[in-house]
Amino acid sequence: MSRSLKKGPFVDHHLLAKVEKAVAIKDKKPVKTWSRRSTILPEFIGVTIAVHNGKQHVPVYVTDQMVGHKLGEFALTRTFKGHPADKKAKR
């Protein structure tokens, strides 16, 4: 179920302040955040945000097609190592 339009998109205040500061001084360093739940706003376009995936910060360069999605969608938390090999096929 999507969020109500009258509420508007959710963005953590500390993340919004960091991004606005980075845009104002044209800083190219990634903005570090643990806020995977924040929605990407048009103000974030062109900024690199380092999103925490539980182990490390994954750099995410925000483009116009990402607006409206959550930051956590672009920093995967699970690594797929592949299915175990079939023991019958090895014989």
Swiss-Prot record:
Molecular function via GO: rRNA binding; structural constituent of ribosome
Cellular component terms per the entry's GO annotation: cytoplasm; small ribosomal subunit
GO aspect biological process, one term: translation
SUPFAM superfamilies assigned to the protein according to its UniProt record, in alphabetical order: Ribosomal protein S19 (SSF54570)
Keywords, comma-separated and alphabetical: Ribonucleoprotein, Ribosomal protein, RNA-binding, rRNA-binding
Pfam families attached to this UniProt entry: Ribosomal_S19 (PF00203)
Keyword RNA-binding assigned: yes
Family recorded in the similarity comment: Belongs to the universal ribosomal protein uS19 family.
HAMAP family: Ribosomal_uS19
Role this protein plays: Protein S19 forms a complex with S13 that binds strongly to the 16S ribosomal RNA.
Protein name: Small ribosomal subunit protein uS19
